[in-house]
Amino acid sequence: MGSCLSAESRSPRPGSPCSPAFSVRKRKNSKKRPGSRNSSFDYRREEPLNQVPGRMFLNGSTEVACIYTQQGKKGPNQDAMVVWENFGSRTDTIFCGVFDGHGPYGHMVAKRVRDNLPLKLSAYWEAKVPVEGVLKAITTDTVNNVTNINNPEDAAAAAAFVTAEEEPRTSADMEEENTETQPELFQTLKESFLKAFKVMDRELKFHGSVDCFCSGTTAVTLIKQGQYLVVGNVGDSRAVMGTRDSENTLVAVQLTVDLKPNLPAEAERIRKCRGRVFALRDEPEVCRVWLPNCDSPGLAMARAFGDFCLKDFGLISVPDVSFRQLTEKDEFIVLATDGIWDVLSNEDVVAIVASAPSRSSAARALVESAVRAWRYKYPTSKVDDCAAVCLYLDSSNTNAISTASSISKLEDGEEEELKATTEDDDASGPSGLGRSSTVRSGKEIALDESETEKLIKEADNLDSEPGTEYSALEGVARVNTLLNLPRFVPGK
C-alpha cells in the first residue's frame, strides 16, 4: 500500500523508501511525487491519450461544451474533468465527467480515474455483453454467502449489506424510469457503468501506482447518445440540467442525488457494516464516515473510489445510474464539484450559465461566480477547488463560439500545466489508442458472470432518499477527510 505516516508517529516504517537504509539506493528517485509507487514514469506514455481528437481535459471549449477549473486555497487542485466527443468512435456520442479528489493523494486519484474510467466504460460498451434476463435476475448467491460465513461480525456486516440493498432504488429522476419505455441502450450502458466502476475501484486497490488507502475521488459522469442520456454518479459531485417548463421558463432539474452519509439508506448500510456515522460538534451539518474503533478518516460521502480503509465498513463505489430521454426543451447540463454547489444553488448555477456572454465562457463564469460567493459568504474559510463542465444540448445556436480549431484551447501557461498534470499522475498510461475496444490499464481485472449478476442486483436495489434536493455543505470550511489518518499496519 505504500508508506503511510500516522498522525501520532512521523517515523517511517523500516524498509520504506524514507528509511535511512534506502537513502543511497533511492537517491535517483528522490524527486518522485509523494504517493506515487512507480518512479519510472515517462511523460511520452501519456501523450497518446492527451492527443486523442475530441478529448478535452484542460480549460477550453468546443461547439457543444466548455470546461473550467480553478485551484482553491487548500493545496493542489484535486478536481479533474473531461469532455470526450465522438466517444467510442461514435459520432453522435459524448462522454463528460468531473472528479473531486480528497485525502493526501486525492489529486492523483482523481486524474487516474479521469483517464482510465472512460476507457473501461467504452470497452465494456463495445463488448456488447448480453444483458437480457441478467438485469432482472434475482439470485440467492448473496444470501447463501451470508449464511455460510463463520465469523459472526462478518456475517452481520454482509447481512446488513443485503438488507440495505433490498429496498428499491430511487434516483433523482425516478419519474423518468419506466422499464417498459427504456431503450436497450440504457440496459447495455447501465451494465457497462456498473462493471467499469467496479473494475476501476479494484484496479486502484490492486494495480494502482497511487496510495488510495486514505485518498479517493467522487465521479459524476454521463454519456449522451442522440437524445438519450445516461448518468452514473458516485459521491457528492452533482449534475443539473437547465430546461424549459410549460410556461417556457428556464428551470433547474437535478439529475443526481448527493450520495452522503446523511441519507438514511446510506447511513443504515454503513452502520450495519460496523462503520460509524456522525457529525463533529464544530460542523453539525456535515455527517461523516468513521472507522469502528478509530476517530478517522471522517469521510464526508457515502460512496467513492478509493478510500480502502473504509471499504469493509460500508463505503462502496457502486454508481447510481439513471436514464433520461432528452426533449427540445432541454438546453444544457452542468456537471460540477462541490466547490460550486457549496455556495451556489441549482437555480443560481442554471441562471449563471444561461446568462454567460457566450457558450465558451459559461464554465469559467460559473467557477468565478462560485469563487466570489465563497469569499463573500465565508470570508474566513479557504476557497475550495472548483471545476465545471457545461454541455449544450442544442449546438445550432449561432452564439456558440467555437470551431474545430478552438477545441481544447489552452490559455497562457497551460502547456506547462499539461506537463505538470501528467507528471503528477501515475505511470500506467495507455500504450496506444485506436478504437476504444480494450481496457488499457495494465493488468486487467475481469468480472465473471456470477459477479456481474450480483453487482447489477445490488445496484438495482441501492436506495436513495426520494423527493429531496440535498444541498452541499452550509457554512463551514470544506474538508472531505480529516487529517487524522489511521496508522498503516506493517505487513497488511
Swiss-Prot record:
Basic and acidic residues bias (residue ranges): 441-460
Pfam families: PP2C (PF00481)
CDD domains xrefs: PP2Cc (cd00143)
Root EC class: hydrolase
Ligand binding (Mn(2+) 1): 100-101
Ranges of Acidic residues composition bias in the record: 412-427
PPM-type phosphatase domain boundaries: 64-393
Keyword Manganese: yes
Family annotation (InterPro entries): PP2C, PPM-type-like_dom_sf, PPM-type_phosphatase-like_dom
Enzyme Commission number(s) of this protein: 3.1.3.16
Residues engaged in binding Mn(2+) 2: 100, 338, 384
Keyword Magnesium: yes
GO molecular function: metal ion binding; protein serine/threonine phosphatase activity
Note on cofactor: Binds 2 magnesium or manganese ions per subunit.
The reaction(s) this protein catalyses: O-phospho-L-seryl-[protein] + H2O = L-seryl-[protein] + phosphate; O-phospho-L-threonyl-[protein] + H2O = L-threonyl-[protein] + phosphate
Protein family (similarity comment): Belongs to the PP2C family.
Protein name, UniProt field: Probable protein phosphatase 2C 33
Organism: Arabidopsis thaliana
